[in-house]
């Protein structure tokens, strides 16, 4: 079995972490499906750990797991890792920027700037519905990502 050093030698020139940013129902997961990529997804990790993608009682454990898996992907040389979660505030995004700096890679944000009412309407047609009041609270908390946070690129999807 190869050691970590051999994996590091296979690294691509500049690895990237790409964070999805936006409300539930804004199109983050659909966007990634269309790209044909498998992201590190907070919903998928919740489902894996608790057999329930809506279980918010394990929030810290879910994001700790995502960051662990992200670091492992960087160490073995994966060129791009997409992270699918809401990432509403600079504080929620900061750990990924720190990881990117530690590993010498770029970190980008893809911001889904979709009106709240459209997100609520889309969300109401899902299997796992986030209550409208929770969506409103999330929208009030949402701070659009900026390059000043440490992103090498911010892409806005409308």
Question: What do these predicted ranges mean?
Answer:
Residues 2-21, 26-29, 34, 38, ...:
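Conserved GTP-binding G-domain of TRAFAC-class P-loop NTPases and closely related GTPase folds
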Residues 16-18, 79-83, 107:
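Generic beta-sheet signal
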Residues 26-81, 91, 116-120:
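Conserved substrate/cofactor phosphate-moiety recognition/catalytic segment
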Residues 39-42, 104-106, 131:
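Short hydrophobic/aromatic-enriched beta-strand-loop microsegments
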Residues 48, 52, 87-128, 137-146:
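ATP-dependent NMP and nucleoside kinases share a basic, alpha-helical "lid"
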Residues 72-76, 102-104, 148:
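Conserved catalytic network of the ASCE P-loop NTPase/AAA+ motor domain
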Residues 80-87, 152-158:
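Phosphate-binding beta-loop-alpha motif at adenosine-nucleotide cofactor sites
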């Amino acid at each position: 079995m190869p050691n970590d050093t051999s994996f590091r030698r296979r690294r691509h020139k500049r690895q990237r972490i790409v964070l999805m940013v936006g409300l539930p129902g804004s199109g983050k997961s659909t966007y990634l499906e269309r790209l044909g990529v498998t992201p590190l997804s907070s919903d998928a990790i919740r489902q894996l750990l608790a057999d329930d993608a809506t279980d918010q009682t394990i929030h810290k454990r879910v994001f700790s797991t995502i960051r662990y898996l992200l670091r492992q992907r960087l160490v073995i040389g994966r060129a791009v890792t997409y992270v699918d979660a809401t990432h509403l505030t600079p504080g929620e995004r900061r750990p990924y920027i720190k990881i990117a700096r530690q590993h010498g890679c770029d970190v980008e944000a893809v911001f889904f700037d979709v009106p709240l009412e459209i997100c609520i309407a889309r969300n109401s047609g899902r299997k796992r519905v986030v209550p409208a009041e929770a969506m409103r609270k999330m929208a009030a908390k949402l701070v659009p990502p900026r390059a000043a946070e440490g992103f090498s690129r911010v892409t806005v999807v409308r």
